[in-house]
């Protein structure tokens, strides 16, 4: 597993955006052979989306032949609700780039049959062959997407009950009122993520330090679903300095030396 230790959250956004642009351009996507990109929501990727929009407007990348799959969506929120992940993605990314609407894939949390919706999503991913690059974030408790602690490490897209910790953390988007935060969500599974050709996880802030430590220095453990990244042949974590505070000094130095050339590209 790769670890890219940077100074700030801003640098994490810039580095990850440039990495995505390089992967898309290197792939040379076409209408018949699109680049398939997995995407998260939340506060952490906002810097990345901002930088991707800037790079797109500067003419450095086109999303015309990029297909996207989002990680998750709340159950029961209307798509046009300001805190739905449909709204988040359109407001913070999709409406600013040249992606084709038919290439955007987000789970439908209002489907009549949620189990069937999850199967449909898995089948749609398989129809593309695989996700080329899945970008994600991590929760304070180490969850990826909505794969909460004790999730199966081979899980597929499914309905999940959100933990109280996750609902408290997300209540900041609902005016601080946890009762407004949905109790259920649809989420890709850990196994779904692991099927991607490459996974890039963004980690920023001291609040994520324990999760980063568990992912990098701990053992693979279903209580820290992020730790599964250790088993991926092309897993990578891009982090800022505050998030590394629980790592051993020698661990950080090791990756600083190992990734010096890549870090220097900023």
Swiss-Prot record:
SUPFAM superfamilies attached to this UniProt entry: NagB/RpiA/CoA transferase-like (SSF100950)
UniProt pathway annotation: Amino-sugar metabolism; N-acetylneuraminate degradation; D-fructose 6-phosphate from N-acetylneuraminate: step 5/5
This enzyme's EC code(s): 3.5.99.6
Residues forming the catalytic site: 72 (proton acceptor), 141 (for ring-opening step), 143 (proton acceptor), 148 (for ring-opening step)
Record GO terms (molecular function): glucosamine-6-phosphate deaminase activity; identical protein binding
Keywords: Allosteric enzyme, Carbohydrate metabolism, Hydrolase
UniProt cross-references to InterPro entries, sorted A to Z: Glc/Gal-6P_isomerase (IPR006148), Glucosamine6P_isomerase (IPR004547), Glucosamine6P_isomerase_CS (IPR018321), NagB/RpiA_transferase-like (IPR037171)
Pfam families the record matches: Glucosamine_iso (PF01182)
UniProt catalytic activity: alpha-D-glucosamine 6-phosphate + H2O = beta-D-fructose 6-phosphate + NH4(+)
PROSITE patterns with a match to the protein in the record: GLC_GALNAC_ISOMERASE
Keyword Transmembrane helix: no
Record text on activity regulation: Allosterically activated by N-acetylglucosamine 6-phosphate (GlcNAc6P).
Marked site: Part of the allosteric site: 151, 158, 160-161, 254
Gene Ontology BP, a term: carbohydrate metabolic process
Keyword Hydrolase tagged: yes
One GO term describing the cellular component: cytoplasm
Function recorded in the entry: Catalyzes the reversible isomerization-deamination of glucosamine 6-phosphate (GlcN6P) to form fructose 6-phosphate (Fru6P) and ammonium ion.
HAMAP family: GlcN6P_deamin (MF_01241)
NCBIfam families: nagB (TIGR00502), PRK00443.1-5 (NF001685)
Family: Belongs to the glucosamine/galactosamine-6-phosphate isomerase family. NagB subfamily.
Subunit structure: Homohexamer.
The protein, known as: Glucosamine-6-phosphate deaminase
């Amino acid at each position: 597993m790769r670890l890219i230790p940077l100074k700030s959250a801003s640098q994490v956004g810039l580095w990850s955006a440039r990495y995505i642009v390089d992967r898309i351009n290197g792939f040379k996507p076409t209408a018949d052979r699109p680049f398939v990109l997995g995407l998260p929501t939340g506060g952490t990727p906002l810097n990345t989306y901002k930088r991707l929009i800037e790079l797109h407007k500067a003419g450095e990348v086109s999303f015309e032949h990029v297909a996207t799959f989002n990680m998750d969506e709340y159950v029961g929120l209307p798509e046009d609700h300001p805190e739905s992940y449909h709204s988040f993605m359109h407001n913070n990314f999709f409406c600013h780039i040249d992606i084709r609407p038919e290439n955007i894939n987000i789970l439908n949390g209002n489907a009549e049959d949620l189990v069937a919706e999850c199967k449909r999503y898995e089948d749609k991913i398989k129809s593309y062959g695989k996700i080329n690059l899945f970008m994600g974030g991590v929760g304070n408790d180490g969850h990826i997407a909505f794969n909460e602690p004790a999730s199966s490490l081979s899980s597929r897209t499914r309905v999940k009950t959100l933990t109280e910790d996750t609902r408290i953390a997300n209540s900041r988007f609902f005016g601080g009122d946890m009762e407004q935060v949905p109790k259920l969500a649809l989420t890709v599974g850990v196994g779904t993520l692991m099927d991607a050709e490459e996974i890039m996880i963004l980690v920023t802030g001291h609040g994520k330090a324990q999760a980063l430590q568990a992912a990098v220095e701990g053992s693979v453990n279903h209580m820290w679903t992020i730790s599964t990244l250790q088993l991926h042949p092309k897993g990578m974590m891009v982090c800022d300095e505050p998030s590394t505070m629980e790592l051993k000094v020698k661990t950080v130095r090791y990756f600083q030396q190992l990734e010096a050339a890549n870090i220097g590209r900023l």
